[in-house]
A protein has these predicted regions:
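Glycine-rich phosphate/pyrophosphate-handling loop used in enzymes and phosphotransfer proteins
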Residues: 1-158
Length: 158
């Protein structure tokens, strides 16, 4: 068992020398433990902190539409921002795994605020059937998968 792990670590290190994993934002090589976005770029992403406010702008969008316990947007979508670049790679670049990674980042940060307390299910925003056919996946569902992986809250796509 130890030999197998050592071989995997060695092979992974060797492949990283030949094909370094790079940050999708700045292009610098990722450190061990970083996933698709380096720590510096992750820290600099424009967070809304809406999860800290009851009655935030995202929740207000749903008032009178559907029964809702909580809603938030974790990042601002600003012209020219690094988050916009990440989102475009997720939506139009076929990099659906970025959604799961971003969902895990988001859930890990929101856990300490008790944002998920009392939440029974995660419902990703549905994507129009034509867009889903073209893209091959729903980016919201991939973000929800990342959130679910950290929180253990099930996803309902029906």
């Amino acid at each position: 068992m130890k030999h197998t792990l050592l071989i995997k670590d060695w092979l992974s290190s060797f492949l990283s020398l030949l094909f370094p994993r790079c940050c999708v934002v700045c292009g610098r090589p990722l450190a061990k433990g970083e996933e698709c976005i380096c720590t510096v770029c992750n820290i600099n992403l424009p967070r809304t902190n809406y999860h800290l406010r009851k009655d935030n702008p995202v929740e207000r969008l749903f008032w009178g539409q559907i029964p809702l316990e909580r809603a938030t947007s974790f990042f601002f979508y600003e012209k020219g921002s690094d988050f916009r670049l990440i989102l475009h790679r997720l939506k139009y670049g076929g990099q659906k795994e970025i959604g799961a990674i971003m969902g895990r980042y988001m859930a890990a940060e929101l856990l300490s605020s008790h944002f998920f307390q009392g939440i029974d299910v995660i419902i990703p925003i549905p994507l129009h059937k034509k867009k889903q056919q073209i893209r091959g996946y729903n980016q919201s569902e991939w973000i929800a998968r990342g959130v679910s992986a950290v929180t253990g809250i099930p996803i309902d796509t029906e």
